[in-house]
Regions:
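Extracytoplasmic gate region of multi-pass secondary transporters
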Residues: 1-36, 40-43
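Transmembrane alpha-helical cores of Major Facilitator Superfamily
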Residues: 2, 35-40, 67, 120-128
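Interfacial helix-cap and linker-helix signal at transmembrane-aqueous boundaries
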Residues: 19-20, 52-53, 137-146
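Helix-to-loop junctions at the C-terminal end of transmembrane segments
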Residues: 44-57, 141
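Structural signature of the two symmetry-related core transmembrane helices
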Residues: 60-75
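Paired small-residue
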Residues: 72, 83-91
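Intracellular juxtamembrane helix-capping segments at the cytosolic ends
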Residues: 98-111
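Multi-pass alpha-helical transporter architecture, strongest
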Residues: 154-176
Length: 176
């Protein structure tokens, strides 16, 4: 859940500044375009899973979403064209859309008697990731002479750890 929160909020929080610097547009337009495209794509992802979720394996969907998120971070950080950087930012919204609800669903199935305490712990873990993730991106950006692409590249660690965690959980589940 920490990695889900960090993956989502790191890109969402930095999207407007990233769009401004990558596309060279004004702050007002960047504040609208970056977060809006991210949010629209996130909504599409949640709508898609809400409509077709019962037909999909949640673990596989989470792994695919984490891999897509990693690709989006790489595209946002490394693509040579500003338009592709924007595509990476936007598609990241789609990739993170299932991470929080998916983590809650997996935990609910794994720990059916977890109750309120489990949901509180998951919320706290997501919030921790949402606080620490953007902070790490910001610190790396600042250390790299305000190069936001380097900061976003450092953010690749969040979806990578999420994918590894889900793979380990899936592997453990298959052994039982």
């Amino acid at each position: 859940m920490v990695c889900a929160g960090a993956s989502e909020i790191s890109m969402a929080q930095w999207a407007s500044a990233y769009v401004e610097s990558a596309l060279g547009i004004s702050k007002n337009i960047g504040d609208i375009i970056g977060p809006c495209l991210f949010a629209i794509m996130m909504g599409i992802s949640r709508f898609f899973y809400g409509k077709y979720g019962e037909k999909l394996d949640l673990m596989k969907f989470m792994i695919a979403s984490g891999i897509l998120c990693l690709i989006c971070y790489l595209l946002a950080a490394l693509a040579p064209l500003p338009f592709l950087n924007l595509v990476g930012c936007s598609l990241c919204g789609f990739s993170v859309g299932i991470m929080w609800p998916g983590t809650i669903s997996i935990a609910s199935k794994k720990i059916p008697l977890g109750g309120t305490a489990m949901f509180a712990f998951l919320a706290m873990a997501g919030d921790l990731g949402g606080a620490v993730g953007p902070g790490i991106v910001g610190l790396v950006t600042q250390a790299a002479n305000d190069n936001l692409k380097i900061g976003v590249l450092a953010g690749c660690v969040f979806p990578a750890v999420l994918v590894l965690s889900v793979l380990l959980l899936k592997r453990k589940r298959e052994k039982v």
